[in-house]
Amino acid sequence: AGVLSLTGCSSKDTAASTASSAPLNKLDSIQKSGKLVVALEGAWQPWSYHDASDTLVGYDVEVSRAIAEKLGVEPEYVESDWDSLFAGLDAGRYDMVCNGVEVTEERAKTYAFTTPYGYIHTALAVRKDNEDIHSFEDLKGKTTANSLASTYMELAESYGATVQGIDTLEETIQLLTAGRIDATLNADVSFYDYLNVHPDADFKIVAQTEEASHVAIPLRKGDASATLLEAINNAIDELRADGTLKELSEKYFGQDISSEN
């Protein structure tokens, strides 16, 4: 399948009123409005970010656009920081979050997750001259920087690190290379992409989780979302079967993250 073009609209910290109510059938409401309101950060390359022409691009952007096409609607993108994404979903300000969200037992208690569309490992990065940190166990008593309420923050804290809240990977790398934090955690593919763009960046990856995390789309739980969940799952299955997910993965990550290896 060919890579889909990017022509949808984008708004900053705002959402369409069509996503603000809680209809009896969310899928019917979306298809009647002709819009699928999608929330993402827009500042996490290569998941969602602005290119040199300030166009919103990325794996999550194109995956959600392909899903919207399967549903017969247009995507409307809402950009927000990580900490606000779930609050906005809870409030019904948008229909779904497509932002490299890892499925966890705790999140699954609150949200209905779709079929995974990505599989990633969490990696640990330090400055190139750091000889103290070689594993996650070495984080005890160290300082890291990550988005608050992220799985990366939770993992760092579980190993005894103090976590400084930060919004973007770019800011995190700046803190790390300046020596203001000891380490940081993120998706392995995000670090590799950063190093591909900035080959002279002063950091190295020293460890990563053995088990892959499942990346999926969270929806609000409830009967109103049941048909929407089924429709998105069907769309993801079709996009995997026809090779679209693989193609988009290789475009943005240089490898296929759409299937569990």
Residue ranges and their predicted role:
Residues 4-8:
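C-terminal motif of bacterial Sec signal peptides marking the signal peptidase cleavage site
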Residues 18-100:
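Extracytoplasmic small-molecule ligand-binding "clamshell" domains
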